[in-house]
């Protein structure tokens, strides 16, 4: 019973084979998935998929690489789509200083606004941060985390940074990057954080874990992330899967609906 808390089954790479991907995931014990939409086409597809499959949920928001296109019309669109009963979070939102498709001040403004929306709507928010960890921290700290909390998606910082984010009310999510040989900082985080503060994800079709590194990632491969982190922590894969699934269901508000 594994919950992939961040996958992009809604992108073109998976078009026409979503059922196959969901079936393979089930074979490997991945029984719930959070489909993340980050622009209009992927948001629309995410909502179509969650309507079709009981075990799928959606997170929708405006990605930092799209921050330059955020308008009042886009915000109205998001507010409408966020009403969908299977939307469990707002995201992925944040800062991306790697691609810099929008100026820092524009990214910051859009990030802050969407954090505010998440709190207004009583939803957790999901954060994308790349080459921008310190600024991301300062913005979350100044805006504050609502009672539903937030998720640091595909975390790639140190234990010190992870603990700072956890103190703000965030939960740390690990993608296949944790399995990479040189990812020693991330492995330390996955080993040392309290069990109730961690989640697992794929970010499929990106960031495939070892032993599939370099290939297309698939939501089924959350299994490899679970296996790796459970070994790090000296516990069984079943124990880690149960704990991270319970964490996801709590954050997404699914524990009260079951």
What residue spans do the PLM features occupy?
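Mid-domain alpha/beta scaffold segments of enzyme catalytic cores
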Residues: 1-258
């Amino acid at each position: 019973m594994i919950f992939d808390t961040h996958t992009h089954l809604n992108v073109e790479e998976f078009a026409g084979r979503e059922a196959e991907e969901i079936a393979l995931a089930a074979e490997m014990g991945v029984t719930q998935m959070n489909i993340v939409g980050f622009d209009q086409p992927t948001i629309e597809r995410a909502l179509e998929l969650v309507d079709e499959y009981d075990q799928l949920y959606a997170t929708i928001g405006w990605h930092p690489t799209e921050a330059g296109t955020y308008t009042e019309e886009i915000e109205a669109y998001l507010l409408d789509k966020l009403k969908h009963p299977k939307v469990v979070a707002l995201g992925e939102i944040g800062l991306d200083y790697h691609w810099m498709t929008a100026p820092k001040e524009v990214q910051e403004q859009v990030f802050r606004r969407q954090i505010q929306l998440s709190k207004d709507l009583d939803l957790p928010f999901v954060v994308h941060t790349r080459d921008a960890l310190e600024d991301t921290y300062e913005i979350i700290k100044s805006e504050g985390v609502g009672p539903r909390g937030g998720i640091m998606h595909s975390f790639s910082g140190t234990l010190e940074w992870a603990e700072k984010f956890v103190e703000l009310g965030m939960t740390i999510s690990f993608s296949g990057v944790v399995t990479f040989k040189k990812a020693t900082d991330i492995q330390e985080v996955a080993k040392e954080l309290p069990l109730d503060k961690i989640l697992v994800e794929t970010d499929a079709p990106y960031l495939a874990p070892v032993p599939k590194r370099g290939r297309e990632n698939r939501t089924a491969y959350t299994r490899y992330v679970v296996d790796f982190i459970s070994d790090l922590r000296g516990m069984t894969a079943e124990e880690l899967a149960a704990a991270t699934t319970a964490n996801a269901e709590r954050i997404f508000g699914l524990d009260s609906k079951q």
